[in-house]
């Protein structure tokens, strides 16, 4: 397994490291100019959402040592100055949220990185969603995007529905947990005024490109889906509401059967299925991209349905980052 570096040790960076440990992937370096190694230990050890790290973590001689393994720590602001090669890091997770274009993310290559995986949507980098379009990956691609957590939830479900019943058109709403870009109390927020309102006090309508991005990973759905978000005052776990018009009529039971078939088959581990009386906290630290809620969906008639799917927007997504890297490594 090739060695991994992480740029940006925030929510996703830290959880990618947790996911890497769970999956036996080898992280050898972390870069973050705003956090020293002792602070990294603290932030990695204690997590208000996912709980304490169950292994050991310490700082020794400038290294971050997790479960006895030394991880090199850099503190460079400019990705071009990170000497990834000195740590042997070849696949870089770009999780700052800042360097999200091919031009900006490819500066990592100057320090010896071979590939860069952006943990966010990208305006120009090829986007991949595990279980949906990994076969489009080519070894000559240097910079790729793992899309967004919401696209990772929506795309596998949309694929199953479109493959079996044909999506004519659809609208998506994600009821989305709070993220780090929001404000604890009302504050300025550039052009998106509503986004600046207190996260703990409000349900905030917001934009999302997640549904349109599905058209990039499933070309047959290009122009057929769009969506919006409601930001809600919960710390983690979000839920997608996909309302679609179908080309081929189907009962809700037939739809459930096809989703369950995919969840137990080709999309196992990516798409989950539940028929229990679940609520959002039941999905904390769930590793699926998407868990279909059979009891929450509704059907108006055989061609117009509302489908519901849950996702841990932090940890499910972080697991897919590692899965994408593992897939790339198998092809490179």
Curated annotation (Swiss-Prot):
GO terms for biological process: canonical glycolysis; gluconeogenesis; glucose homeostasis; glyceraldehyde-3-phosphate metabolic process; glycolytic process. D-glyceraldehyde 3-phosphate binds at residues 148-150, 179, 208-209, 231. The active site is at 149 (nucleophile). The modification Phosphothreonine is found at residue 274. Its EC number is 1.2.1.12. NAD(+) binds at residues 11-12, 32, 77, 313. Keywords: Cytoplasm, Glycolysis, NAD, Oxidoreductase, Phosphoprotein. GO terms for molecular function: glyceraldehyde-3-phosphate dehydrogenase (NAD+) (phosphorylating) activity; NAD binding; NADP binding; peptidyl-cysteine S-nitrosylase activity. It catalyses: D-glyceraldehyde 3-phosphate + phosphate + NAD(+) = (2R)-3-phospho-glyceroyl phosphate + NADH + H(+). GO terms for cellular component: cytosol; mitochondrion. The modification Phosphotyrosine is found at residue 273. Pathway: Carbohydrate degradation; glycolysis; pyruvate from D-glyceraldehyde 3-phosphate: step 1/5. It is found in: Cytoplasm. It is an enzyme of class 1 (oxidoreductase). The record marks 176 as: Activates thiol group during catalysis. Homotetramer. Belongs to the glyceraldehyde-3-phosphate dehydrogenase family. This is Glyceraldehyde-3-phosphate dehydrogenase 2. It comes from Drosophila melanogaster. The gene is Gapdh2.
């Amino acid at each position: 397994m090739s060695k991994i570096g992480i740029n940006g040790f925030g929510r996703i960076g830290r959880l990618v490291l947790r996911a890497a440990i769970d999956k036996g992937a080898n992280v050898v370096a972390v870069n973050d100019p705003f956090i020293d190694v002792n602070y990294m230990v603290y932030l990695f050890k204690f997590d208000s959402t996912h709980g304490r790290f169950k292994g050991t973590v310490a700082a020794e001689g400038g290294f971050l040592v997790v479960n006895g393994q030394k991880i090199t720590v850099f503190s460079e602001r400019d990705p071009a100055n990170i000497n990834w090669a000195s740590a042997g890091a070849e696949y870089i997770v770009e999780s700052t949220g800042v360097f999200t274009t091919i031009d900006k993310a490819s500066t990592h290559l100057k320090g010896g990185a071979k590939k860069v995986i952006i943990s966010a949507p990208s305006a120009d980098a090829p986007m991949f969603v595990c279980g949906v379009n990994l076969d489009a990956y080519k070894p000559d691609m240097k910079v790729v995007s793992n899309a967004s957590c919401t696209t990772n939830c929506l795309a596998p479900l949309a694929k199953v529905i479109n493959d079996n019943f044909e999506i004519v058109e659809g609208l998506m709403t994600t009821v989305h947990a709070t993220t780090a870009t929001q404000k604890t109390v009302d504050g300025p927020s550039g052009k998106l005024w509503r986004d600046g309102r207190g996260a703990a006090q409000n349900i905030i309508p917001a934009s999302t490109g997640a549904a349109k991005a599905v058209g990039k990973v499933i070309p047959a759905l290009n122009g057929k889906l769009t969506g919006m978000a409601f930001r809600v005052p919960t710390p983690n776990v979000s839920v997608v509401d996909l309302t679609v018009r179908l080309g081929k009529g189907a009962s809700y039971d037939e739809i459930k059967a096809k989703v369950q078939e995919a969840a137990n088959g080709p999309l196992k581990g990516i798409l989950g299925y539940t028929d229990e009386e679940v609520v959002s906290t039941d999905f904390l630290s769930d590793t699926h991209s998407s868990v279909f809620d059979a009891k929450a969906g509704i059907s108006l008639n055989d061609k117009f349905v509302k489908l519901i799917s849950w996702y841990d927007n932090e940890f499910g997504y972080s697991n897919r980052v590692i899965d994408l890297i593992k897939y790339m490594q198998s092809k490179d």
